Amino acid sequence: MKVILLKDVPSLGKADSVVNVANGYAKNFLFKNKLAEPYTERGQKRLDLKVIKRNEQHDLLALEAKNLAKQLEGVVLEYDIRTNEEDKAFGTIGFKQIVDDLSKKHIFVTKDMLDSKMKLDIGEHRVKINIFEGIHATILVKVSKAQ
C-alpha cells in the first residue's frame, strides 16, 4: 500500500515522502498513530504544494541571511577589559556582550550563530558568525586594556 508520511518514521522515511508498506503495517500502526495517510492524487497535490512552499520559504530565509551578512561585513566592536600588573585579563568578552552590542546597531543575531569555542582576550579577533546554511559573516572584535 502506498502512503504519504506525515512525520519522520525511523527505517521507513522522512516526513512528506511517499513509500510502499504492507497493508497491515499501514492500517494498524501508521494510520492509527497518525504517522501517515493513504496515498491519493489529492494528497500528492497537497504534498507538491507543501514542498513548493517550503522551497520558497527556504529561498526567502537565504535572501534574508545574505542581507544580514552584508550588514555584518565591516562591523568593528571595541571593548576595554581590566587587567592586572602582568597584563592578564580579568575575564573575557562573551557571547551576550557581542549580541547586545550588535543589537544596539540594529543588527540582530543570536548567540547560537557565534562560534562556541571563541575566547576573546586582549587583542584583535575575527569572529565568524554562521547565519544560515553556508552563509557566514566575519566581524572584527578589538579588546584592549582598560585605562
UniProtKB/Swiss-Prot annotation:
Molecular-function GO terms, alphabetical: rRNA binding; structural constituent of ribosome
UniProt-listed GO biological process terms: translation
Recorded superkingdom: Bacteria
Record keyword Ribonucleoprotein present: yes
Its biological purpose: Binds to the 23S rRNA.
Database matches in PANTHER family: 50S RIBOSOMAL PROTEIN L9
UniProt-recorded name of the protein: Large ribosomal subunit protein bL9
Protein's organism: Mycoplasmoides gallisepticum (strain R(low / passage 15 / clone 2)) (Mycoplasma gallisepticum)
